[in-house]
């Protein structure tokens, strides 16, 4: 099936914060843009300005001053299908510049995605975009494939939601999947708050983007939080400076590791949930006792919010403290983990053995949207 780009499958990973899209067989997504749709706040007064009724992605981001921005995906789950359709349209026609009716499309979904949502995705692909074939895969499973494994537990943490997903021989174990509504956006908000305490004011959505950039460039996870705090009080070794777009330079020290510490101590932002280490442990404990050893030895990190320096060592330390003392613990943090869901999709869609797994248009026409539950699991 894979003979050149004419019928190369498309892979589209729709995240809360970013859409990652491209062609199966590539080693990285061609298009990465924000999952946002913006509509003008006011009607245009300039005649012939060619105002659009909606802007998507980077264009919406850059014109955010005159737009009302909406995120059609919240906590990993689509909640606004009209806007989602606009995002897919933009992905195919503007970003990848392909005709979706000529390519099979692999979409990704959050773990525990409601059944009605999978059906809706399937329906839109076949009825709105007329794709010849499609498939829906669980994000965490794709990340595990990308790491070259079929068994393990994936901690997938993006912008809107984190999940721990135990996978055995390629199948996610739904009863043991745990969701934590704590992710990148919450960390950005927390950093905005601790910078405000220091007298810097970041409030607008535009300023939030600056803080997100600061978080991504300067934050790291301390191996021992209390000790790191002590060090930061007496020494300037953790201080780093950051230049704002207007040329002002700000210096941040302890904020660098205070921000992502929330992942391990959600109580810092008033959440009662256990941290990512405990959630991972709880997920493993919900699995059959015979497979736990395989899970402890294959803890795979995935998603943009796992990109902080020091996260692998800290995760390893925390889980070792929770697990039985004789247990061998291995935390895998692949360098490309920001895109590992997409990469896993690219690998899967280009396997020769996968070609009979696609839902073909003819099958959809015969069975309707519920076909997705029979063919994608």
Swiss-Prot record:
One of its GO terms (molecular function) is hydrolase activity. Keywords: Acetylation, ATP-binding, Cytoplasm, Cytoskeleton, Hydrolase, Nucleotide-binding. It catalyses: ATP + H2O = ADP + phosphate + H(+). Its main location: cytoplasm. The modification N-acetylalanine is found at residue 2. It is an enzyme of class 3 (hydrolase). Displays particular expression in the root cap and pericycle tissues associated with lateral root development. Little or no reproductive-gene expression is detected in vegetative organs, such as stems, leaves, sepals and petals. CDD domains: ASKHA_NBD_actin. PROSITE patterns: ACTINS_1 (PS00406), ACTINS_2 (PS00432), ACTINS_ACT_LIKE (PS01132). It comes from the Eukaryota. The keyword Secreted does not apply. Its EC number is 3.6.4.-. SMART domains: ACTIN (SM00268). There are 8 actin genes in A.thaliana. Polymerization of globular actin (G-actin) leads to a structural filament (F-actin) in the form of a two-stranded helix. The binding of profilin to monomeric G-actin cause the sequestration of actin into profilactin complexes, and prevents the polymerization. Belongs to the actin family. Actins are highly conserved proteins that are involved in various types of cell motility and are ubiquitously expressed in all eukaryotic cells. Essential component of cell cytoskeleton; plays an important role in cytoplasmic streaming, cell shape determination, cell division, organelle movement and extension growth. This is considered as one of the reproductive actins. This is Actin-12. It comes from Arabidopsis thaliana. The gene is ACT12.
